[in-house]
């Protein structure tokens, strides 16, 4: 077994986003764990390099022993701020800027939710926020639906990658529309990261 097969999602083809080469194609979050220790052990076992942090839901005070950030080594993991829970472009942009001011890098997983029940994205607001944040120097990874036209517009708006959902967040339904995801992948010139509902 080669070293690359030991790293989650690794292939022999480099995975590059906005000039940064990542050793793993798997990204994991920090939510829903019972304890910080469980979170750390799960992330470590995953082999992921990129860890998303929902800015609205965590303390950005790294000195707090009970905070998520106190348990994640930034020299080991690439911490990606996430605007999960934001329902307007203005709200998402506010939290992206807050994360950067608090010491995160300029990367952001941009989410603008349009429906509270399904957590499907508001693509019009997402496009607005993407255009503005990309203009401010953010590297935007946009959580979106599996629509090719929206993905193309996000590329034009300055996104560095799109993250089309496999199925609604938390549904565990897996990849519902492989044709749409495949079409997006073939048509876009930058990375496509399948996100949400992928199951376990």
Describe each region flagged by the PLM:
Residues 2-29, 66-67:
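N-terminal amphipathic alpha-helix/helix-capping segment at the start of soluble metabolic enzymes
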Residues 12-17, 32-50, 63-78, 86-200:
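Alpha/beta enzyme core
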Residues 29-30, 54:
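Short, well-ordered coil/turn residues at beta-beta hairpins
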């Amino acid at each position: 077994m080669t070293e690359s097969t030991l790293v989650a999602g690794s292939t022999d083809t480099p995975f590059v986003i906005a000039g940064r080469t990542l050793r793993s194609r798997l990204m994991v979050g920090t939510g829903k764990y019972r304890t910080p220790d469980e979170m750390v052990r799960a992330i470590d076992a995953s082999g992921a390099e990129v860890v998303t942090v929902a800015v609205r839901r965590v303390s950005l005070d790294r000195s707090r022993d009970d905070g998520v950030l106190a348990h994640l080594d930034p020299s080991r993991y690439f911490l990606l701020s996430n605007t999960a829970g934001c329902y307007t472009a203005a709200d998402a942009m506010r939290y992206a800027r807050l994360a950067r001011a608090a010491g995160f890098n300029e990367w952001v997983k941009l989410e603008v939710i349009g429906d509270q029940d399904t957590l499907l994205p508001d693509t019009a607001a997402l496009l607005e926020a993407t255009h503005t944040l990309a203009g401010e120097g953010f590297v935007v990874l946009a959580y979106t639906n599996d629509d090719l036209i929206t993905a193309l517009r996000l590329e034009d708006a300055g996104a560095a990658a799109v993250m089309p959902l496999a199925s609604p967040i938390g549904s565990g339904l897996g990849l519902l529309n492989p044709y749409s995801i495949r079409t997006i992948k073939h048509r876009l010139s930058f990375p496509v990261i399948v996100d949400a509902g992928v199951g376990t």
